[in-house]
Every structure is written in structure tokens, then in C-alpha cells.
Design a protein with these regions (language model features):
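N-terminal hydrophobic/helix-forming segments and targeting peptides
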Residues: 2-4, 8-378
Length: 378
């Protein structure tokens, strides 16, 4: 079992941890992959994923045996034209966004949310508005705290109490630049915090989309797996796992692995009794629960042991809030596993991950794919 150790009074599967000091990837060997940076730079709120889709195509199509964009906009990159089993790897390329709902007489843009925002984090952010004429810069605003009563200061503003300022003098001037239904994203780019810890908007789930496609690229260059592999960059996950519903029908997998971010709880104000203990740099988070096929989970554990990859185990008693919930029940059911990338500050403009965890996720998927035997069923 290498450096695996057991925590006292727990079953091995609940406490399987690889000693971090012996397995953590050297920070000096970790460089942000250009593919990942391109995905993060792409603006792709749910339903408006064109920029991210173009990035996936330009990085993956030349390595795939086939590359298909379905009617909803999911990208399907396949390795192996036929094969049993078919392994689906899924990560979503959409991100949180804002959508313009109203333009006032004074030229201010009122908006609603695409996806689940923390309203307390919205005001004072620079945003890019995606229009048919190009990008329009703006800043989110609300009434200054100095102009609020004591009671008003205690309340989080509703969406209709905030706006985007693009510097327009009136409605007509604003309409020359934007229109109702245009989407916007925060302008918060990639930065290195310390060693392998990095911050950006939209690691949820550009990091997962990078991981599934990078796994396919590595499988294309090394020894080919016995199975067919389909890396799917799904869309509209943030508004109800919609892309996963349609893509699972086209991919028609025998087994699936979904990669999404998962809450790291190694920060203040996280109750481990309620949320569990998960840390950046601790390795991929593997979920157990009704949404997860036990055989797929066990195979992931075996692959992690083989590659000496540290893993963290999460229990979820409900359908997870990921594409796994949709893929598991597609067609006549799909044995599904869920791999989490530990992340701090989810659904904010500044999400933090460890690049070492991301690399471990890619390695784990590559090993899983190569472990599948021809005709194998779960």
C-alpha cells in the first residue's frame, strides 16, 4: 500500500490518505498549462459557451479520432472509433454569468443571474459584456454604504437593486452598445498566489474541462486503452446539468467519470462535522453515495493506489450537484464516478485550487481508462 495510512477507528475506504509530505508535486515542476489558461480566458456563461468551445476545438480536435459538437453545444472528442466499454469523461465549460434584463433612461444596465451567485460578492466588480459588436466593459454598482441606513447596511442587495455602469449618458447611447439578453462575466483573471496555489474566476469548471480533455490527449500519445474514450466538454451545467442530459445520449457510455470542483474546507469558518475535512494539495476528492456506482469508486481507489495518488473521500447522500446526477440516469443507467478538484471560494470571482491536485486528477483518469478491459462491465 506504499505510503497509505489509516486513521484510527475508521474503515480503510473512509480514511485512505497518502502522506502529503511524500507525494505532493514539487511546486517548481508545476506550470500553468497553456490550454487551461486559454479556457480561463474564454468568457462562457451558461448558454453562451462559444469562446470556450473554440478553445477546446483548437486544442483537442487534432488529437481525437473524431470531434463532434452536438445540437446543444457539447463538444465530444473521441479516441477509438468503436469499442466496448465506452468511457465518457465529462467536465463543463460553462461558468456563472449575468444577463442584461433592463436598460434605464439614464443608461444603466439592470441584470439577473446566470447560475448561483452570492449576491454579497457582486457589487464593485469589473465585467465584460459579450455583445454582437464585441466586448463592452462595465462595472457593477449599488448605492454606497454611506447613503444607506443602519438597517439597509445589514441587508444583502437584491439583483434589481444593483446595476452595470458602462459610462452611457442615456438609454439610447447604451442601446448602441448593448441589447437586452447580452451576457456578462466578471473580469478576474488567473494569478499565482503561492507555489502551486492559483486563483481565477471560473475554475468551476474550466479546471474539470481541462482535465478530461488533457486525459484524452495523453491517452492519444501513449499506449492506447482497450476502451473507447469520449471526452465531453458539457454546457449549461450551472443552470441544471442540461448539457450532460443530451451529451450522455450521444456518447452512449458504458461507464462515466465526471470531473467538477468540490469544496475545500481548509479555511476558517468551515465546520468539518457538517462538511467533512478536505484540503488543497490533498489530492482528488472521490465521492461515495447513491449517485456513485460502487464498482467505479473501487476502481478509482485501486488506480490511485497504483499511481500513489493521494485521495480524499466525500460522502454525499443525495444526487450530487454535478453532471454526474444526469449521466447516471441517462438511457438505461450509466455506472458513474465523480472526481472532485478541491477548491476554495466556490461561485465567487476568485476561486482557488492547487495545480498539483489538478495534475493528479488527470493522471487518475488516464490510469482508470487504461485499467478497463475489452468487454468489461460494471
Amino acid at each position: 500500500m506504499g505510503n497509505w495510512k489509516l486513521l484510527p477507528n475508521r474503515s480503510w475506504v473512509d480514511s485512505l490518505i497518502l502522506m502529503k509530505k511524500k507525494t505532493k508535486t514539487s511546486a517548481t515542476s508545476l506550470k500553468p498549462p497553456a490550454f487551461l489558461l486559454d479556457l480561463l480566458n474564454a468568457r462562457s456563461p451558461s448558454g453562451y459557451e462559444e469562446e470556450a468551445r473554440d478553445v477546446v476545438r483548437s486544442n483537442v480536435e487534432k488529437y481525437a479520432d473524431s470531434f463532434v459538437v452536438d445540437n446543444l453545444g457539447n463538444c465530444h472528442a473521441s479516441l477509438g472509433k468503436t469499442g466496448s466499454p465506452t468511457l465518457m469523461l465529462a467536465g463543463h465549460i460553462d461558468e456563472l454569468g449575468l444577463i442584461i434584463k433592463h436598460i434605464s433612461d439614464k443608461g444603466f444596465l439592470y441584470f439577473d443571474a446566470i447560475g448561483g451567485h452570492d449576491r454579497s460578492m457582486i457589487s464593485g466588480r469589473r465585467v465584460d459584456i459579450l455583445t454582437s459588436k464585441g466586448t463592452v466593459r462595465g462595472v457593477t454598482g449599488k448605492r454606497a454604504i454611506h447613503l444607506m441606513s443602519i438597517e439597509e447596511r445589514k441587508r444583502v442587495p437584491e439583483f434589481h437593486q444593483m446595476w452595470i455602469d458602462i459610462g452611457a449618458s442615456n438609454r439610447e447611447e447604451a442601446l448602441e452598445r448593448v441589447m437586452i439578453g447580452d451576457a456578462a462575466v466578471y473580469d478576474h483573471g488567473f494569478e499565482i498566489l503561492n507555489d502551486s496555489l492559483v486563483v481565477s474566476r471560473a475554475f468551476d469548471d474550466k479546471s474539470g474541462a481541462y482535465a478530461v480533455n488533457e486525459a484524452l490527449l495523453r491517452l492519444s500519445k501513449g499506449s492506447k486503452p482497450s476502451c473507447k474514450v469520449v471526452a465531453v466538454s458539457t454546457v449549461q451545467e450551472e443552470i441544471g446539468t442540461r448539457g450532460a442530459i443530451s451529451s450522455a445520449h450521444l456518447a452512449d457510455p458504458d461507464v462515466a467519470l465526471v470531473v467538477d470542483v468540490s469544496h475545500a474546507t481548509d479555511h476558517p469558518d468551515a465546520d468539518h462535522r457538517k462538511y467533512g475535512r478536505f484540503c488543497l494539495g490533498g489530492g482528488p476528492i472521490l465521492t461515495r453515495g447513491p449517485n456513485i456506482h460502487p464498482g467505479v469508486f473501487e476502481r478509482l481507489i485501486q488506480c490511485a493506489k497504483k499511481e500513489k495518488i493521494s485521495v480524499q473521500i466525500e460522502a454525499d447522500p443525495r444526487p450530487t450537484g454535478t453532471d454526474a446526477r444526469a449521466i447516471q440516469v441517462a438511457r438505461n443507467g450509466v455506472p458513474t464516478g465523480l472526481i472532485g478538484i478541491p477548491l476554495r471560494y466556490m461561485h465567487t470571482p476568485s476561486e482557488v485550487i492547487d495545480l498539483g491536485d489538478l495534475e493528479a486528477v488527470v493522471r487518475l483518469m488516464v490510469t482508470f481508462a487504461r485499467s478497463l478491459k475489452k468487454g468489461e462491465k460494471f
